[in-house]
Amino acid sequence: MKLFLISAALVVLGLAAVADAIGCSDPSPFQGRWVIGVDKKECVALVKEKCGNLRDYTTGRWVRGQHVKSNCGSIPKFTAIATFLKPGNKYLGHAAIFESCASDGIWVYDQWNAKPVERRKIRYGNTGKPNYNGDNFYTIEL
């Protein structure tokens, strides 16, 4: 009975964590084009315009959620993710739309001011560019 209660509690906690993930619309139709919003062609423009109600919030309101690499199996496809490299786990770096994980990185859709939306792999272990290191991505919560 005790084992059952512990298992049930873990399932509920896991579901709560997934429920906090901010879902995004399928970004694949936008490949090769920029998604432009108040943040112009920056990475956050894609995420703010295509994910939940993020356009209503500045990045300063974003909260670091689940670590993508550690929780890959439970993060839904097309979830808003970002790096939170500022002190206090505040957003700084890069934002993208999560697709899936691979053994050597994460597959995302992203853009930045020099590159329109594309599907690409952000590899783990890129210590030279922490904002492009798959180890540093977390789900975005509000």
UniProtKB/Swiss-Prot annotation:
GO terms for molecular function: hydrolase activity. Changing C43A: Loss of catalytic activity. Disruption phenotype: Feeding interruption, and proliferation of bacteria in ticks. GO terms for cellular component: extracellular region. InterPro entries: Dae2/Tae2-like. Tick gut and saliva antibacterial peptide that directly antagonizes host skin commensals which enter the ticks during feeding. Acts as a cell wall hydrolase that cleaves the bond between gamma-D-glutamate-meso-diaminopimelate of a peptide stem and D-alanine of another peptide stem in peptidoglycans. In vitro, degrades peptidoglycans from both Gram-negative and Gram-positive bacteria. Is not able to traverse the protective outer membrane of Gram-negative bacteria. Is not able to kill Borrelia burgdorferi, one of the Lyme disease-causing bacteria. This is Domesticated amidase effector 2. It comes from Ixodes scapularis (Black-legged tick). The lineage of its organism: Eukaryota, Metazoa, Ecdysozoa, Arthropoda, Chelicerata.
